[in-house]
Amino acid sequence: MVDIIIPVYNALDTLELAVTSALMQGDVRILLVDDGSTDGTARLCDELAHHPRIAVIHQRNHGVSAARNAGLQAAASEWLTFLDADDVLLPDAIGNLLTLAGDSQAIQGLVTRSEAPDVPECTVQTLPSRDMLDLALRNPTVHLHTHGWLLRREICNERFNESLRLGEDGEWMMRVLRGTKTVARAQVNAYCYHLRADSAVHSAADVVREYLRTLTAAQPTLNYLDMPDAAAQYRLMHLLLMLTHGVVQEGGFRDGLRQCGAIRRLCRE
């Protein structure tokens, strides 16, 4: 059996579709973690939990990392995966990944923005964890997130850093992959990611500040891995993400310069 952890916050319009896609995966248990929703989502979670394969956890609003941690605490199956409440798992995703995983402790499927993507030639590549980490650090937006990953519960002893607001899933995945022996990558459509309408609610200054906090939190893991070239690319990718949102806002030039200085110091370390 596979536990599917769905952190939920004010997802009244999308949750049922996400849950339906999860139930279609076969032998799964769905853990809905309601993070203090205020729009009727909590009541919907209770209604959905009448299904024998759905359980619900209600908690006060502490953010997506706290919700994922509550799901990890409740997980009991050999394997687990995460699904955001406004995304969907593609048909047969879990079954295909389980079949291809073999003895690997984690396997990553393909993430798409289409619910009817082209079907790739089904292949799987098994890598030592260090090789996977090198690849992930060089391409964090492709690999360092929870989307499309199927993980053995035994490697998920780490918890999400609840103080982080952006890039927190990538920082967690780094720590999880650090504890693996082999990881598989599968050319299998697994996860459909929907662009968030609220993904730009942060001001540019907040985005820079939060990504900088994530880089600082990731520093001990990067030091432990001792992969300087890959780590430099990881930091540079975060710098590009910050620049995409704009480092300097009107009236915030000095603050932007200070934060750029902090980024440069991190890169030198």
Predicted stretch roles:
Residues 185, 190-269:
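C-terminal subregions of glycosyltransferases and related glycan-biosynthesis enzymes
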Residues 20-29:
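Short, acidic, metal-binding catalytic loop of nucleotide-sugar glycosyltransferases
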Residues 92-121:
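Conserved donor NDP-sugar-binding/catalytic core segment of glycosyltransferases
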Residues 80:
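Short aromatic/hydrophobic "clamp" motif used to bind/position activated sugar donors
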Residues 132-206:
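Conserved nucleotide-sugar donor-binding catalytic segment
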Residues 59-75:
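Glycine-rich, basic loop-to-helix element that forms the pyrophosphate-binding segment
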Residues 21, 34-43, 62:
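A conserved acidic beta->alpha catalytic loop
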Residues 13-17, 39-47, 88, 92-94:
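Acidic helix N-cap motif at the loop->helix transition within catalytic regions
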